């Protein structure tokens, strides 16, 4: 619960209307009513403003709506996220080690840590202040988890792997499983021991059922601020830069390096031992088989500059007609050749 003036101070916005109105929750513009605050970031929803009964609306400068309290800001979508956090995202009170959890005596737990039933915390594990381990989390020996982390149900972190501060790991993720390393011996495959670790820096979010393999030697590294969607596979010795986005079902093969501020769309596949430069965007379902330079947009399999891919995709639609045309031309050529021979 907060007043509109308080929320304006939080996001650095300007109030138009009654700043003393009390707001209880954030709601979609279609269903927001009295006591709710909503937002409009996409221009196509502006028409809904005239019918809203919300107590306040977050909008960009220049938008007017008589009779509606407005919170004016430069970035309504970012403001929405901050207000949603302020009104809804309250962390539960710390509960310590709950009945049904098993914590090795050698483990070190910081102040205000919560360990839910079904958790297993191994030898010499360190868990930082304010971190919550939800039911069924398993931390192998020598794992380090930083402060104010949320490790959700069923997450497994294998030996010696490290999580920084404020890391969020969604249910079912596996961090530090063996990398896919096998040496052919002429008859079969000899398993290569995977003796490295996974290191995840501060403010990273790992989605549900993500798998991040430990390095064969050294470190599989996820740098600060990166966000990983559900069902992503990151192989051994991969390095992901800062503030990079990996959308669902991305797969990155071993030893590839993705730069800072990159975005890989859903189901992008990256071959091994490649380098993707900073600020690179790759469209969904693309296949990357060679290094990509920084600051460009790519699509397709194999990847090509996005504009070239658009042209190629447009040509694909014409292929049936082109095939028919070529077939007709071939027949005409054959007929002409036959006439020439007959002369």
Swiss-Prot record:
This is UDP-3-O-acylglucosamine N-acyltransferase. Belongs to the transferase hexapeptide repeat family. LpxD subfamily. Keywords: Acyltransferase, Lipid A biosynthesis, Lipid biosynthesis, Lipid metabolism, Repeat, Transferase. Transmembrane segments: none annotated. One of its GO terms (molecular function) is N-acyltransferase activity. Its EC number is 2.3.1.191. The gene is lpxD. Catalyzes the N-acylation of UDP-3-O-acylglucosamine using 3-hydroxyacyl-ACP as the acyl donor. Is involved in the biosynthesis of lipid A, a phosphorylated glycolipid that anchors the lipopolysaccharide to the outer membrane of the cell. It catalyses: a UDP-3-O-[(3R)-3-hydroxyacyl]-alpha-D-glucosamine + a (3R)-hydroxyacyl-[ACP] = a UDP-2-N,3-O-bis[(3R)-3-hydroxyacyl]-alpha-D-glucosamine + holo-[ACP] + H(+).
